[in-house]
Amino acid sequence: MFGSLVKKVFGSKNEREIKKLWPIVARINELEASISPLSDEQLRDKTAEFKERHGKGESLDALMPEAFAVCREASKRVLGMRHFDVQLIGGMVLHSGKISEMKTGEGKTLVATLPAYLNAISGKGVHVVTVNDYLARRDSEWMGRLYSFLGLTVGVIVHGVEDDQRRINYAADITYGTNNEFGFDYLRDNMKFSLDDYVQRGFNFAIVDEVDSILIDEARTPLIISGPTEDSTDKYYVIDRIIPLLKKGEVKEEEANTLSGKRKLYTGDFTIDEKAKSATLTEQGVLKVEKLLKVDNLYDPRNIEFLHHTQQALRAHAMYRRDVDYVVKDGEVMIVDEFTGRLMPGRRWSDGLHQAIEAKEGVTIENENQTLATITFQNYFRMYKKLGGMTGTADTEAEEFHKIYKLDVVVIPTNRPLLRPDFPDVIYKTEREKFGAVIQDIKEHYATGQPCLVGTISIEKSEVLSELLKREGIPHNVLNAKQHEREAEIVSQAGRLKAITIATNMAGRGTDILLGGNADALASQWRRANPEAGEEEYQAILKNYKTVCAAEHDEVVRLGGLHIIGTERHESRRIDNQLRGRSGRQGDPGSSRFYLSLEDDLLRIFGSERVSKIMDFLKIEEGEAITHAMINKSIENAQKKVEAHNFDIRKHLIEYDDVMNKQREVIYTQRREILGGQDIRESFLEMLDETVEEIVASYAIEKSPAEEWDWQAINEAVFKCFNLQFELPQDTMARLTPAGLKEMLAEQAHALFAARVKEMGDDLIDHLIKVMMLQAIDTHWKDHLLNIDHLKEGIGLRGYGQKDPKQEYKKEAYELFMGLIMRIREEVVERIFWVQLERPEEVEEIEEEQRSKKIVFNLSEEEERVQEPARSNRVAGRNDPCPCGSGKKYKKCCGK
C-alpha cells in the first residue's frame, strides 16, 4: 500500500527516467528550425564538425541534441521518415547503455540510427546486431542510405562473406551483422596466425536488436568452433537397436528407509523426467542393457561410454520428437529453435545426443567433434565498453538483464495509444476440445473477413491445425520452420481481408504486419514472377496494389484489426507477449485470445493439478470451457516458476563460464602478444627460467643434502627439456643449495640458447619461437577445453559429498589451467632446444601447415552447435544437493 502511494506521488522509476529525457527532446525540437534550412552538403558537413569537436574534448552526451537533430533531418530527406518524439527518447536510452522496450511497429530500426550516428562520431565503430542475415542485410541497405548521406561508411557481416571483405566491413563506421557472425569472427580471429588476418577491431558500442532473444533465449547456447575426432559411429547404431527392447517404467511408492531418507523404487527398465529432459536406467534396466550389449558391468570405467550413450539414446527416443524438437530434411537432422520455431542448420546437440537422434531416424551419423574454441553470448557481449538493446518484450526479464548484464530496461511510451483488448484465456479439459474451439473461432472471423494470426508452439501442432482447417475448406497460410524461406512474404500479407495465417513462434519478428496488406511487398513479388516486365508496367501494378490495400485497410480496421489466437501458452510469458504484439501496432485496432487445455505441455508438466482441481470443483463437462481469473493466475504462476528456474540455470551457467572466460582472456591475450612479436625473445627466456625453477623445485629438496637429491631424475629432466648433458663438478656437491643449482642450470641453458641463436640467426630463431608457441598454445588449449567439459559434467555430484560444486569447479579449473600453462611452457622450451632445421624454409612450412589446418576447421569443418547444460542423470531426492550445481537442496532450488 505504501509502495503504491509513493508511486502515485513520485511516479514509477520508469516514469522518472522518461521525465528526465523530455527536456532534451524539447531542445532537439528547437534545433529543427535551424537545421531544416541547411542544404544537403551543409547537413553532411555537420558530421565532420561533430568529429572535430569530439576530437577537441567535447563529449558525445554534449553533442547528442545536435547530432539527433541532424540525423532526424537527414532521415526526413533520405527515407521520408521523421523520428517521433518517443523515438528520440528510445535513441537516448540506447545511447546511455540501456534497453529500450518499444512495442511492435514503433520503429525500432529507425530508432537505432540515432545512437548509431552519434557513437560513430568517435571513430571507434558501432555494431548493430540482428537475429538473422535477412534483417542484417535489409537494415544495412535501408538505413545505410541515411548514414552514407551523412558521410559515414556502413558494412554488413553475414554468412558467406570472405575475410578480406569482412575486414573492410568491420572497419566501417557502422557495421550490421548477426550475433552468431560477430561471435564466430571473434573466435576465428583468435585462431589466426597473423594480426593482419584479424577481421574485427575493438568492442566499442553494440546495439542489440531483439535483445531478449539474443541475451536471454540464446544465453545457454555457446558458440563452438570444432574439428572432427576419429571415433567410430558404429556404437550409435548398436545402442539404437537395443532401445526398443527397453520398457518405460514409473515411480512406485517410496519404500525402504535408507540413511538419506526414503528411496524411490521403479518399475520397468528406465524412467524419464520431462522437466529436466533426462532419462535414467533403473537397476532392472542396467542388468538388461548389460545382457544385450554383452558387457559384465556397465559402471566399469571401461564401459562407462556405453552407459552414457545408452542414456543419450533413451533421451533421443523418449524426449525428442520429430517435427517438434527437430525435423529431418535432405537426410539431415535439423534442430528447431524452441523460441522462434526456426530451423537452425549447422547446429548440433552435443555430447552424443545428435548422433543418437541420427541413429534413431536412420540417417547418416556424423562424427562427434572436438571443441577448438568456444564462448557464450553472455561473455561475448559483456566485452563491449557500452551495450544497448531494443525489443518489444523485455520488462518481464528486467531483473535478469540487470543482474547479469548490468542493463536497465526502460519502457518507452507508444506514439499512439494501444487499442488491443487481450481477452481472458479459455481453458478446456482436452486438446481435441480446444482445437475444436479454435477452428470455430477462426471460422467466425473468416466469415466476417477479419484476418487471424494463429500461434502454435511446434511444427507438429501447426500441421495438425492446418489439416483441420483444410477439412473445413478454409484457405490459409502455414508459417513454420519448413516454410521459413517464405517467412517475410507470408507475414507481410497476414493483415489482408480473410487472411488466416498459422505460425509457430517465429511469426516473422522484424517484419511488420500491415492491415490490408503490404503493397510494396506484393509488387516486388509480382516483379520476381515477371522479370521481363518494364518499369512502367511495374509502377502501374504498384499503384493498383496500393489502391487495393488501402481499401482493404479501411475494411479490416472496421472489422476490428488483426485477431491473434494463441493455441498454447509458452513456458515464457515474454514469448506469449511477442505473439500478442503482432497486433495493435501504431494505434491500429486488434484483439487477442489464448485457448488452452489441461493436456498442454505447460499445464501438464508444471501446473495442471491445481487447475484440474478447480475444474473438477466447478463440475466442468466435456466440451465446456472455463474462463476464470483464478485459473489465469495459476497459469501465470506456472510460467513464473519456469522462468525463475531457467534464470537460475542461466545464472549458474555464467558463474561457471566466468571461470573459463578469464582463462580464455589470458590465452587469447598471450596469443595476440606473440603475433605482435612483442618481446618474444624475452617471453621465451622467461619460459626457460620457469622450466629450470620447476625442475629444481621437483627434485632438489631444500632441507636435504645435495647427495640425497634424485640426480638421475634431474639429469633426465634437464636432458629432456634442454637437450643438455648436465654435469656437476664433484667438489661443488657438498655445498650445493637449490638456489645454487638453479643458477648453474639457468646459466648453462642460457649459454646453449645463445649458441642456437648464433647458429640460426636472430630472425629465424624469433620466427621459430613464434611458430612453436602458437602451435603449443593451440594444441593444449583444445585439450584443455575438453578437460573443462569433463570437469563441468561431473561437478554437480560433488554436492553429495557436502562440497560446494561451484567452489570445487573454480579450484579444479584453476589447477587444470596451471597445468596447461606448464605443458605449453615445457613443450615450447623442448622444441626450441631439440628441433633440427635442414633449411630455413622449414619454419614457414610448419607455420603454413598449421595455418591450413585452421582454415579447414574454419570453413569446411567448422560447426556451430548447441551445447546443453550438463545434468546429472540421477534423479535427486528432495533433500539431496540440487544437480544444477547451486549447492542448495533440490527442494529449495529446481525442485520447488
Swiss-Prot record:
ATP binds at residues 87, 105-109, 512. Pfam families: P-loop_SecA (PF21090), SEC-C (PF02810), SecA_DEAD (PF07517), SecA_PP_bind (PF01043), SecA_SW (PF07516). May bind 1 zinc ion per subunit. This is Protein translocase subunit SecA. One of its GO terms (molecular function) is protein-exporting ATPase activity. Its cofactor is Zn(2+). It comes from Pelobacter propionicus (strain DSM 2379 / NBRC 103807 / OttBd1). It is found in: Cell inner membrane; Cytoplasm. Keywords: ATP-binding, Cell inner membrane, Cell membrane, Cytoplasm, Membrane, Metal-binding, Nucleotide-binding, Protein transport, Translocase, Translocation, Transport, Zinc. It is a peripheral membrane protein. The keyword Ligase does not apply. Part of the Sec protein translocase complex. Interacts with the SecYEG preprotein conducting channel. Has a central role in coupling the hydrolysis of ATP to the transfer of proteins into and across the cell membrane, serving as an ATP-driven molecular motor driving the stepwise translocation of polypeptide chains across the membrane. Its EC number is 7.4.2.8. The gene is secA. The keyword Zinc applies. It catalyses: ATP + H2O + cellular proteinSide 1 = ADP + phosphate + cellular proteinSide 2. GO terms for cellular component: cell envelope Sec protein transport complex; cytosol; plasma membrane.
